[in-house]
Amino acid sequence: MSQRQPQSPNQTLISITNDTETSSSAVSNDTTPKGWTGDNSPGIEALCAIYITYAVIISVGILGNAILIKVFFKTKSMQTVPNIFITSLAFGDLLLLLTCVPVDATHYLAEGWLFGKVGCKVLSFIRLTSVGVSVFTLTILSADRYKAVVKPLERQPSNAILKTCAKAGGIWIMAMIFALPEAIFSNVYTFQDPNRNVTFESCNSYPISERLLQEIHSLLCFLVFYIIPLSIISVYYSLIARTLYKSTLNIPTEEQSHARKQIESRKRIAKTVLVLVALFALCWLPNHLLYLYHSFTYESYAEPSDVPFVVTIFSRVLAFSNSCVNPFALYWLSKTFQKHFKAQLCCFKAEQPEPPLGDTPLNNLTVMGRVPATGSAHVSEISVTLFSGSTAKKGEDKV
């Protein structure tokens, strides 16, 4: 008869624990504390594949998000309302990639939680803050795109950038508030296998023996960080679709071309935000479902099998990968960002094309000419400068 091993209650990223080593012991058939040796345990090839995958996620994610942030701060034309939110999203992804992903990678070789009680609280707080920033930012972005599509010709106020920065800061504060209980109640708990007389330390948001708390925690995480925000986003995008379906351009002929371009630009950005939302939903769904499954079908012991381990690794990797795919989705969807991304990636400054007259600020437009002087053949130069506080064509929605 095969020996039954304990199964840690949390085998998902949503509760950042050292449960992978206990789940690895669940797929092992040996009696050693590590849980990595035995007929059913992952071999060196599997470990190498796991660490290569994590290394790719971390390096590619840091590179992509760092370039996105650099493009935003170095390129004046990219400092627009939607790009402020997207840059805030990149900061949240970088935070996760620099802290939680490397910590999670240590679980596959370590026997217990390595970072102590303080590390447990801090990392739990960072992890949930990053997830909150991502989903709440996407929700606000969807609301912003709905307003832009419904009122495509409305000029933004002069303080729009400042107000958007304040909104982005508010999202971070709200995410931290939601993550605060996680930091307060997270602790290092002992998980024991009576058959092997071995104990493991696990960073959890609740005592391992409290099944009801586990069920409540998994449901709250699923609702607050997935179902509710995505439901709000779905409502906004259904309204956007209805508006676009019913819309007719009842505008004067001389303004037709400019209005169409502005509307098409805002529709294109709405599509970009929708792709980012879809990527978030796809990457995080397996993680949430797996956490719910383990919370409501908890068993103290599980038969040794590679399947739980593989499914757990897949859900973690997919969730982490969401933090590195956004810059490349923007590269695919936005020619403007693609140009700046290539310039930064190749370490050279892209040549800036001569801006067309329609994009030239009127407060910087100078007209020069030569006219003959009165009563003589002498030719004089004249220079006329136009002063205005607006531009001929706005770029507030460039992505």
Swiss-Prot record:
Disulfide bond positions: C120-C203
Superkingdom assignment: Eukaryota
Glycan-bearing residues: N10, N18, N29
Localization per record: Cell membrane
Residue intervals on the Extracellular side: 1-41, 104-121, 185-220, 294-313
Transmembrane segments: 42-63, 83-103, 122-143, 164-184, 221-241, 273-293, 314-333
Keyword hit for Hydrolase: no
Gene Ontology BP annotations: G protein-coupled receptor signaling pathway
Topological category with respect to the lipid bilayer: Multi-pass membrane protein
SUPFAM superfamilies: Family A G protein-coupled receptor-like (SSF81321)
Listed InterPro entries: Bombesin_rcpt_3, Bombsn_rcpt-like, GPCR_Rhodpsn, GPCR_Rhodpsn_7TM
Lipid moiety-binding region (S-palmitoyl cysteine): C347
Residue ranges, Cytoplasmic side: 64-82, 144-163, 242-272, 334-399
GO molecular function: bombesin receptor activity; neuropeptide receptor activity
GO CC, alphabetical: neuronal cell body; plasma membrane
Protein purpose: Role in sperm cell division, maturation, or function. This receptor mediates its action by association with G proteins that activate a phosphatidylinositol-calcium second messenger system.
Assigned protein family: Belongs to the G-protein coupled receptor 1 family.
Subunit structure comment from the entry: Interacts with C6orf89.
Annotated PANTHER family: BOMBESIN RECEPTOR SUBTYPE-3 (PTHR45695:SF6), LEUCOKININ RECEPTOR-RELATED (PTHR45695)
Protein name in UniProt: Bombesin receptor subtype-3
